[in-house]
From Swiss-Prot:
Protein species of origin: Cutibacterium acnes (strain DSM 16379 / KPA171202) (Propionibacterium acnes)
Similarity annotation: Belongs to the universal ribosomal protein uS5 family.
Subunit structure as annotated in this protein's UniProt entry: Part of the 30S ribosomal subunit. Contacts proteins S4 and S8.
Name of the protein described by the UniProt record: Small ribosomal subunit protein uS5
Molecular function terms from GO: rRNA binding; structural constituent of ribosome
Alphabetical keyword list: Ribonucleoprotein, Ribosomal protein, RNA-binding, rRNA-binding
Signal peptide interval: none
């Protein structure tokens, strides 16, 4: 009798263990929905009575890889804690980036402090032609084809914020057309509109396949 109880308890324990692991995996998947890039980590020394007190700062870029991105800054006594704070701040500052297919909608120049970054749309297959700091922002935002060039300071923090400034200036072709009182066809190149249509059709097909798989 006692042996039967032990087996039953063991099975229940195994089920509970599997449920716990499944729940943990679900939480990990939710946490891993975003792309994270640590751009810079610096050690900061503060002079206090009796010596110096050290802490760390982290600059992190977070995005969903589908048009949303944010930048955060964190400070703590340990590097992991500084990164965690930066990630949370980045998520609070998410903004949407207008995209046409896998590239940006139009050329733009962003500036922040001494940083100046120029972005230009690129044809499919070009890839992200950019330095490390700008690349981190563009990849997290979901830009796959773009030409980027730093025209100012090479400081990673300045480049990141200049890239963000450039992305925040981007507009949808419809917005530009409405402001100028023209049609979208008069504003946007035919290739851009064609790429957008193909991207929309591909996304719609993917949603239908996913829905069919669920059913």
């Amino acid at each position: 009798m006692s042996g039967t109880q032990r087996r039953g308890g063991g099975a229940g324990g195994e089920r509970r263990g599997r449920d716990n692991r499944r729940g943990q995996n679900d939480r990990n998947r939710n946490q891993n929905e975003y792309l994270e890039r640590v751009v810079a980590i610096n050690r900061v020394a503060k002079v206090v009575q009796g010596g110096r007190r050290f802490s760390f700062t982290a600059l992190v870029v977070v995005g969903d890889g589908e048009g949303s991105v944010g930048v955060g800054y964190g400070k703590a006594k340990e590097v992991p804690a500084a990164i965690a704070k930066a990630v949370e701040e980045a998520k609070k500052h998410f903004f949407k980036v207008p995209l046409v297919g896998r590239t940006i909608t139009h050329p733009v120049i962003g500036e922040k402090a001494a940083g100046v970054v120029m972005l230009r749309p690129a044809s499919p297959g070009t890839g992200v032609i950019a330095g490390g700091s700008a690349r981190a922002v563009l990849e997290c935002a979901g830009v796959h084809d773009v030409l980027a060039k730093s025209l100012g300071s090479s400081n990673a923090i300045n480049v990141v914020h200049a890239t963000v400034d450039a992305l925040q200036q981007l507009e949808e072709p419809e917005e530009v057309a409405r402001r100028r009182g023209k049609s979208v066809e008069d504003i946007a190149p035919a290739a851009m509109l064609r790429a957008r249509k193909e991207a929309d059709e591909a996304a719609a097909a993917a949603r239908m396949e996913e829905k069919a798989g669920v059913n």
